[in-house]
A protein has these predicted regions:
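A beta-strand edge to alpha-helix "cap/lid" segment located at domain peripheries
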Residues: 2-10, 14-17, 23-24, 41, ...
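Short, well-ordered alpha-helical segments enriched in acidic and aromatic residues
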Residues: 24-41
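Short beta-edge strand/loop motif at the mouth of beta-sheet-based domains
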Residues: 37, 46-56
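Conserved short acidic donor-positioning loop in nucleotide-sugar-dependent glycosyltransferases
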Residues: 22-25, 46
């Protein structure tokens, strides 16, 4: 039933709907929107193969649901690109802040591949030269 519904939705809508599950801490709900063989490439860091590795990643890094601030979303064919900011609570209970650019590839209405560029924000921004 969910598959028929997904095929009628735009990929950008599917992604934002899936991310609502992440925001609520329902990671299994999110994973229902991914293909079984989903691949996540975190540029310069790691590659996750399949839902089991993604599930383990979420268990390790999402101590509580991450907080997203989506800046832009662009859909082109089977791809959706999203930029924004994300906050993750670390094991010490403090938030780590990141900028991100995610490029998602869809197959049959499900998220099949992610290429993520994630950059940690450190310290204060440099003072203005004006």
């Amino acid at each position: 039933m969910i598959q028929n519904k997904l095929l009628k939705m735009k990929n950008i809508t599917i992604l934002h709907t899936a991310n609502e599950f992440i925001a609520k801490g329902d990671y299994e709900g999110f994973l229902a929107y991914c293909t079984a063989e989903t691949k996540w490439f975190f540029v310069g860091e790691r590659i996750l193969h399949g839902k089991e590795e993604v599930r383990a990643y979420m268990k390790e890094f999402y101590q509580e649901p991450p907080v997203f601030n989506v800046e832009k979303s662009i859909e082109e064919g089977d791809f959706v690109m999203v930029t924004g900011e994300i906050r993750l609570r670390n094991k010490e209970g403090k938030y780590d802040h990141f900028d991100y650019c995610d490029i998602w590839r869809f197959e049959d209405g499900k998220m099949a591949e992610l290429k993520a560029f994630v950059i940690e924000k450190r310290g204060s921004p440099p003072p203005s030269s004006e």
